[in-house]
Amino acid sequence: MGRSFVYVILGGGVAAGYAALEFANKGIAHGELCIISDEPVAPYERPALSKGFLLPEAPARLPAFHTCAGVNEERLTPKWYEEHGIELILDTRVTSADVRRKTVVTAAGETVSYKFLIIATGARALKLEEFGVSGSDAENVCHLRDLADATRLVDLMQASTGGNAVVIGGGYIGMEVAASLVINKINVTMVFPEPHCIPRLFTPKIASFYEEFYKSKGVNFVKGTVLSSFVINPEGKVTGVNLKDGSYLPADLVVVGIGIRRNTSLFEGQLTLEKGGIKVNSMLQTSNSSVYAVGDVASFPVKAFGEIRRLEHVDAARKSARYAVSAIMEPDTTPEFDYLPFFYSRAFSFSWQFYGENLGEAVYFGDFSGTSFGAYWVHNGHLVGSFLEGGSKEEYEALAKATRLRPAIDDMSDLERQGLRFVVTLSQKQLVLPIVDVGSSTSLVVLEKPEYPWHAAAGVVAAASIAAFAYWYGRRRRRCWMVPFLFPSPRRLWLSNLLFLCSKSSASSLI
């Protein structure tokens, strides 16, 4: 016995919530969509777990951070799903999937069939046992991946005020949790094998700024080594950790943030995997055309890099989820997924954003002794990545636009001198293609201003050529087939629109 839906989302994290909103916006019927999640609550914004949820005063709690609060849209509470006819199958683990038969089976033995499946299973936190260290199940050792983890961590922090915490890992989670521990009046030591924090994005210069600030707040850094064992008392509680370099650290609380592993096991042997995730095409389709993958679990083509990448960040989850719904419901009009890699973090009073990739030579700008500074990365003569701490909304938007353009950089010293002004000026020069109402039953897409100078030149040449040909042909007293398109009547306007849109699409593919 089972149930059948048109659309099934497997997983109940960030991506599931954003996909659900997109389905609702596109007008699916009641009863067509279900979300199957092993968590007991409706989809929520996971970034809150390492930020607002851990605050000692006025902490974030549900329903405040249900999706889609992260982009200031409607919060999708359980009531919202009910009102939109979307079935939430919560606290339910899926034990098997058959993509040929289009079914998934739950731990309770129920079979759920679908027409289209979106895999949004995300990832799980890596455990130290996977590196040969036992003891992660001790009562005061925490990971941070879901609401249950965060709730447990809050309880342990409250019991450890004034005590010692050891944070294993120097990435996003480690840095954000360390800040929260300090705010909760706990002494913090961070341990990681790399030479500096957040090594996947930060240069030594950028990392040094944050590390020095953390040190001023009492955080101790132990770099270049890893945890080798826990010291556990007879009650099953960790009292300290031994490090591979031979040192010992007392601990009332240990938080482990050493990375994630994607939840792909249900589909191994059925779908193509690449780089640790489920491989999808530029429409986010897997090797089975009825199955899509989004968020952390997906390995997708990144046009800016020209290769398949996995991007483990909430922004990619949000945008890929919405895109997949569009690709499923409007496949003929949905362009290829063109995502600009984006990462951000907030801790203490700091807030930074990163776009693109940190490849090539770094060019720094701003005041590294203050609160606003940044960096560009230049590779093969083009700006390919950018970072900014303490920017305004407009400055971050300019950073994103400029990085997507990958402008040529001829003078590195001039780029350094201009600093943030470079991307602000560049973004102001880039103009959009608006849709203009021409007063008929349709709208004509009009190229009001060119995105690039050669676009304008090409447009002028093409227009002049067509006009000259039409004039020459008209002089021969023959009807010019182009005239209806150059001077359309209302009845012919739709065809003019169509031809223009086709040419616009072709041009866009070259940009």
PLM ranges: what are they?
Residues 2-87, 180-205, 510:
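Beta1-alpha1 glycine-rich phosphate/pyrophosphate-binding loop at the start
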Residues 450-481, 492, 498, 502:
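Terminal signal-anchor or tail-anchor transmembrane helices
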